[in-house]
Design a protein with these regions (language model features):
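N-terminal leader/targeting pre-sequences
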Residues: 1-183
């Protein structure tokens, strides 16, 4: 089982943690259990991407996009087809997740064509909109922007950066309090 942290994404970078996704192998495929908060209500595309990076990156047109360094949907067979989780298109196509009106998501999806060994170290992305599992009328199911993501690993590099930043802030505050008391 992997417990991975998910973070808010923008074209400026990787931001605060918004929850976790738990991944585990089952006889029916890879089970992904999302516990997220702070997302817009509604359906959201949910995909494994080809690289293990969620920093901003350039798309094919050269525009910097949120989570662009994750690359495209995982598609090792190079099908080039967006057919959803149950057909033979992108392997990274997952069932969409549903966010409640209060911005929380407590949803579980099953990816029958995947196992942990297929995805460990890669990026998991939540898209702004739902997914119709087609490239019509919009590419990649119409999911639009990448709004959240994480690296499929128990060892979150972004959590370490956040923890180190918080420790630096705490140390600075503590030093300031000590200096103030000395006055």
């Amino acid at each position: 089982m992997i417990k991975m942290a998910m973070h808010r994404l923008s074209n400026k970078g990787v931001h605060e943690k918004i929850g976790y996704v738990y991944l585990s192998d089952t006889p029916g495929g890879l089970l992904l259990e999302a516990e997220l908060e702070g997302l817009p209500p509604g359906d959201h595309g949910f995909h494994v991407h080809e690289y293990g990076d969620i920093e901003p990156g350039k798309n094919k047109k050269g525009k910097v996009i949120a989570g662009g360094a994750a690359g495209q949907h995982l598609d090792p067979a190079r099908t080039g087809k967006h057919l959803g989780p149950y057909r033979n298109g992108h392997l990274g196509d997952l069932p969409y997740i549903i966010v409640e009106d209060d911005g929380t998501c407590d949803d579980a999806v099953l990816a029958p064509r995947l196992m942990l060994e297929d995805v460990e170290g890669l990026a998991l992305i939540v898209h702004e909109c739902g997914d119709n599992y087609s490239d019509y009328p919009l590419p990649n199911g119409g999911g639009k922007s990448r709004i959240a993501g994480g690296i499929i690993s128990n060892d979150c590099p972004y959590c370490k950066k956040e923890r180190n930043r918080n420790l630096m802030i705490l140390g600075t505050v503590a030093a300031g309090v000590y200096a103030f008391k000395k006055l």
